[in-house]
Amino acid sequence: MKVPKKPLKVFFNASVVIAGIISPSGGSGKLLELVTNKQIEGAISELILDEVLRHTDKIGRSQHAIEKKVRSIFSPIFPTPSLALINIWKKLVIDIGDAHVLASARSAKSNFLVTLDRKHLLILQEKVRKFKIVTPKQLIINKIRDYIDYSKA
């Protein structure tokens, strides 16, 4: 008898949330749908929500509508990680403004950090060991098929 796997826990960077809302049929949108359908456990922090809300002009909807949508997908939304944890990750990142993303993914006990930020986060794939940093496509193709219960689809 197969032992059920623990749910896949994925921390979302703001870039993926924004792309998923703009294009629900793309890879980022498919991941948001999997979170909504409870096929994977999705996580964001308050700082990620704030970043998404700062970019509502790219999405073309009101800030209120975007916040309502994001909160309906991700629950709970994790608090901002401690400054001590952020400082640990500052030593690794290229842009210190991204340290909170890695700290949040770690404090949320995520298996994966999904991002579209090639310049600052995906470049760290080989350096981070506590979780995997991947693109939506990498996560869908290489990881999710092992975790999804297709009977819920």
Spell out what each predicted region is.
Residues 11-12, 22, 27-58:
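PIN/NYN-family metal-dependent endoribonuclease catalytic core
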Residues 29-33, 67, 101-102:
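Short amphipathic alpha-helical segments and helix-helix/interface helices
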